[in-house]
A protein has these predicted regions:
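Charge-dense, helix-prone N-terminal extensions
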Residues: 1-121
Length: 121
């Protein structure tokens, strides 16, 4: 008898898993991830929340476009907002794919919003 493959996670279950990962983070990563989630969803509502390597991520058509890495989980001095190769951020032959995050001010939020909108286009 053939083994059944596990069912693919639904968009709803992936969204719940992403929210659970954020809720389980210690501060200040939780506050930053919560704010980033709201910012990403406002800037690119077509992206779907999910997890990727155990961290919150945002996908277009099932492919991760951007993701958050907790400073505490990775034992770094800053959190990271990263973009995958599916992000539409290409600028010539060289462009950044990750950004260090120590604090989210209005200026950073505006820059992140513009980057996410472009990445998801």
């Amino acid at each position: 008898m053939a083994e059944k493959k596990p069912a693919k996670p639904t968009q709803k279950s992936q969204k719940s898993a992403s929210r659970a990962k954020i809720a389980a983070m210690p501060e200040p990563d939780r506050a930053m991830a919560t704010r980033l989630h709201a910012l990403i969803m406002a800037s690119a509502p077509a992206l779907s929340p999910r997890t990727w390597y155990g961290m919150p991520a945002y996908a277009r058509d099932g492919e991760v476009v951007c993701f958050f890495q907790s400073a505490q989980k990775f034992k770094t001095r800053y959190a990271t907002l990263g973009f995958s190769d599916k992000a539409n951020l290409d600028e010539g032959d060289l462009w950044p794919t990750a950004f260090a995050l120590k604090e989210l001010t209005a200026a950073e939020e505006a820059r992140i919003g513009a980057l996410v909108k472009k990445a998801a286009s």
